[in-house]
């Protein structure tokens, strides 16, 4: 029987997408709109203080395409905190116009064996600890997608021996290293938590790099034989100070 992977786990993650009710937004007064924006900016300031204390991280993105208008990404110590954030958003005046859409719940994880070091067990170095509880880069673009490993007869990731999985992931990691400085990623595990098995969040200064890295990785055996993907959501980073201009009528 194949050996299960042991993971070390970090912060909990929530990807929360919202449609914006522009029709209703246009019906309220300019003063009401500004009051709603001011209140929400105060909430963002609260999140910034949490990030400053390294107790969590967040990012807000204007979604490209019609899957959503906004994507909020939150990293926190617990699911209780993630649920509290969702509720805080809904209680604000702006929350009346932020219609809940797709969401994804997961936990940052690293496998205890490092495929980039011949499968040796990881040491919980400062680097690994930082990766488990990261500050999300405030780069211009983010891309999120869920994925799973195939469990088909004869092509079942969970039947492969640990050594073979390590080799395939090493090759996959070498492809990723080509994009160092161009793309950063956060991998979250979601088995038992959401519809897919993992979530992948990529950050880049140039969205073209999302296309390039995902395309090149499609040729890795770990992807060609064993990977399945959900929908991709791409967004542009929204600064707190931009909110008023973005929602102006």
UniProtKB/Swiss-Prot annotation:
Short name of any one Pfam family annotated for the protein: Chlor_dismutase
Cofactor(s) listed: Fe-coproporphyrin III
GO biological process: heme B biosynthetic process
Cofactor binding description: Fe-coproporphyrin III acts both as a substrate and a redox cofactor.
GO molecular function: heme binding; metal ion binding; oxidoreductase activity, acting on the CH-CH group of donors, oxygen as acceptor; peroxidase activity
Enzyme Commission number: 1.3.98.5
Source organism superkingdom: Bacteria
UniProtKB keywords: Heme, Heme biosynthesis, Iron, Metal-binding, Oxidoreductase
Enzyme class: oxidoreductase
Recorded catalytic activity of this chain's protein: Fe-coproporphyrin III + 2 H2O2 + 2 H(+) = heme b + 2 CO2 + 4 H2O; Fe-coproporphyrin III + H2O2 + H(+) = harderoheme III + CO2 + 2 H2O; harderoheme III + H2O2 + H(+) = heme b + CO2 + 2 H2O
Catalytic residues, chain numbering: 145
InterPro entries: CHDC, ChdC/CLD, Dimeric_a/b-barrel
Pathway: Porphyrin-containing compound metabolism; protoheme biosynthesis
Sequence positions that bind Fe-coproporphyrin III: 145-149, 172
Family: Belongs to the ChdC family. Type 1 subfamily.
Record's function text: Involved in coproporphyrin-dependent heme b biosynthesis. Catalyzes the decarboxylation of Fe-coproporphyrin III (coproheme) to heme b (protoheme IX), the last step of the pathway. The reaction occurs in a stepwise manner with a three-propionate intermediate.
Name of the protein in its database record: Coproheme decarboxylase
Organism: Oceanobacillus iheyensis (strain DSM 14371 / CIP 107618 / JCM 11309 / KCTC 3954 / HTE831)
């Amino acid at each position: 029987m194949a050996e299960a992977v042991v993971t070390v786990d970090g912060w909990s993650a929530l990807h929360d997408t919202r449609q914006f009710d522009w029709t209703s937004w246009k019906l309220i007064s300019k003063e009401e709109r500004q009051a709603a924006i001011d209140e929400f900016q105060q909430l963002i300031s609260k999140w910034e203080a949490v990030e400053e204390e390294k107790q969590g991280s967040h990012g807000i993105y204007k979604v490209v395409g019609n899957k959503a208008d906004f994507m909020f990404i939150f990293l926190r110590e617990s699911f209780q905190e993630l649920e509290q954030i969702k509720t805080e958003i809904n209680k604000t005046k702006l929350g009346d116009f932020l219609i809940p859409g797709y969401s994804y719940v997961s936990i940052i994880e690293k496998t205890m064996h490092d495929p980039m070091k011949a499968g040796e067990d990881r040491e919980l170095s400062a680097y690994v600890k930082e990766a488990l509880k990261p500050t999300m880069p405030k780069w211009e673009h983010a891309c999120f997608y869920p994925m799973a490993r195939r469990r088909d007869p004869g092509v079942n990731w969970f039947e492969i021996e640990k050594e073979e999985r390590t080799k395939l992931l090493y090759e996959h990691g070498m492809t990723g290293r080509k994009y160092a400085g161009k793309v950063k990623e956060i991998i979250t595990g979601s088995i038992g938590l959401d519809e897919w098995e993992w979530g992948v969040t990529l950050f880049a200064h140039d969205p073209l790099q999302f296309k390039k890295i995902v395309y090149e990785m499609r040729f890795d055996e770990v992807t060609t034989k064993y990977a399945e993907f959900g929908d991709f959501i791409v967004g542009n980073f929204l600064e707190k100070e931009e909110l008023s201009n973005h929602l102006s009528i």
